[in-house]
């Protein structure tokens, strides 16, 4: 057998042995249920006697049974280590959980599917409104009176009107006369 295959087989055997060993020690998790500002803990172990509860290593008086119901839960006061245990003689069997929960009176629980549905519906409504405005403005543009091309401000047509002479030019911008030799009458040639 080649060395590479031997190492693979040995690694596979170690993984299988580790998985079997882990199954024997695996503990069931606590069940935690939060509704409004009430928190309910369910002890995962099946004890034969009466189950007692501790919070931060202090006995909780009046709380016995598989379920612990904490009403008016406060994150500041009630967060910490919770332990369900049973005492048999002088031997104690316990199961511990650290709990830190935020609760509120008027909260609503929303799952992922509801959030996705809300987002998709929002996008569809937005696109629908966008198309509605687009087609409304397009139909409005088609109904509007057509504008003649080249019409300027005031509805005056451009170009030469045969019934009226052209406007008198502004004297400030009078063209330079050919016979006049003023300073700015022409361009001077510079010596190169």
Curated annotation (Swiss-Prot):
Residues 145-180 are annotated as: Disordered. One of its GO terms (molecular function) is transmembrane signaling receptor activity. GO terms for cellular component: alpha-beta T cell receptor complex; external side of plasma membrane. Residues 163-190 form the ITAM domain. The modification Phosphotyrosine is found at residues 173, 184. Residues 136-192 are cytoplasmic. PROSITE patterns: ITAM_1 (PS51055). One of its GO terms (biological process) is cell surface receptor signaling pathway. Residues 1-21 form the signal peptide. Residues 164-171 are annotated as: Proline-rich sequence. It is a single-pass type I membrane protein. It is found in: Cell membrane. Its main location: membrane. Glycans are attached at residue 72. Phosphorylated on Tyr residues after T-cell receptor triggering by LCK in association with CD4/CD8. The keyword Ribonucleoprotein does not apply. Residues 160-177 are annotated as: NUMB-binding region. Residues 26-97 form the Ig-like domain. The chain crosses the membrane at residues 115-135. Pfam families: Ig_5 (PF16681). The TCR-CD3 complex is composed of a CD3D/CD3E and a CD3G/CD3E heterodimers that preferentially associate with TCRalpha and TCRbeta, respectively, to form TCRalpha/CD3E/CD3G and TCRbeta/CD3G/CD3E trimers. In turn, the hexamer interacts with CD3Z homodimer to form the TCR-CD3 complex. Alternatively, TCRalpha and TCRbeta can be replaced by TCRgamma and TCRdelta. Interacts with CD6. Interacts (via Proline-rich sequence) with NCK1; the interaction is ligand dependent but independent of tyrosine kinase activation. Part of the TCR-CD3 complex present on T-lymphocyte cell surface that plays an essential role in adaptive immune response. When antigen presenting cells (APCs) activate T-cell receptor (TCR), TCR-mediated signals are transmitted across the cell membrane by the CD3 chains CD3D, CD3E, CD3G and CD3Z. All CD3 chains contain immunoreceptor tyrosine-based activation motifs (ITAMs) in their cytoplasmic domain. Upon TCR engagement, these motifs become phosphorylated by Src family protein tyrosine kinases LCK and FYN, resulting in the activation of downstream signaling pathways. This is T-cell surface glycoprotein CD3 epsilon chain. The lineage of its organism: Eukaryota, Metazoa, Chordata, Craniata, Vertebrata.
